[in-house]
């Protein structure tokens, strides 16, 4: 189960994402590193909360979706595929008891093979599963995670990077446009043609020699 894509985990999980009280104390800065096994529970909760609703008719499926995301992510982290990275942003929260790191966001980057309908070309770096804790949104976390992905793609020797966004996700589209992504292709979809579902847009960014600019 890819969002975009331990039985004890089926029980109610208390997220370790940054709380509003902690942010009120002082969110001074955050760091980005590769995800580790101990991050799995927090990452699964953040991804499920970002892409699935806990209310309504599908609310009952939330724990199952969360477990599926947990298992898929665990398998990817264990993989020996050379061109795959899951990154996490850790907020450094300062309070009366001192400072500590808490999960603020995550993103994955891997090489992707072209779909059958796409022009024939070799694999390309593809960004997926970008998610930010609700408490840390509009603080530059997503932008810094994207920049880290761009640096990774550049380190791998690729001149371009790609990602998908739904045409009706205006906030995400605005972020990507501001960070230099451009429309590469509108993905064909029977759901969009027949059912009025939003189209998926494939965006591309050409990477400069200094991708962190």
Predicted regions span which residues?
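Short polybasic/polar patches that bind polyanions
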Residues: 137, 154, 177
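C-terminal "cap" of GNAT-fold acetyltransferases
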Residues: 159-162, 166-173, 178-213
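Internal amphipathic alpha-helical segments of the cytochrome P450 catalytic fold
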Residues: 40, 138, 172-173
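Active-site acidic-Proline motif in GNAT/NAT acetyltransferases
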Residues: 133-135, 139, 167-168
């Amino acid at each position: 189960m890819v969002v975009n894509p331990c039985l004890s985990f089926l029980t109610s999980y208390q997220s370790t994402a940054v709380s509003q009280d902690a942010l009120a104390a002082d969110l001074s800065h955050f760091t980005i590193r590769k995800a580790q096994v101990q991050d799995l529970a927090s990452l699964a909760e953040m991804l499920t909360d970002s892409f699935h609703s806990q209310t309504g008719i599908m609310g009952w499926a939330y724990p199952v979706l969360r477990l599926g995301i947990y298992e898929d992510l665990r398998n990817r982290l264990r993989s020996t595929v050379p061109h795959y990275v899951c990154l996490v942003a850790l907020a450094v929260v300062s309070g009366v008891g001192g400072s500590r790191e808490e999960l603020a966001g995550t993103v994955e980057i891997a090489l992707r093979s072209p779909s059958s309908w796409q022009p024939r070309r070799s694999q390309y770096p593809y960004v997926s599963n970008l998610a930010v804790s609700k408490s840390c949104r509009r603080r530059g976390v997503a932008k810094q995670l994207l920049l880290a992905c761009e640096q990774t793609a550049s380190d791998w020797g690729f001149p371009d990077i790609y990602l998908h966004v739904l045409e009706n996700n205006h906030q995400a589209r605005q972020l990507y446009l501001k960070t230099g992504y451009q429309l590469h292709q509108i993905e064909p979809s029977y759901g969009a043609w027949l059912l009025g579902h939003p189209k998926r847009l494939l965006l591309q960014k050409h990477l400069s020699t200094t991708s962190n600019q």
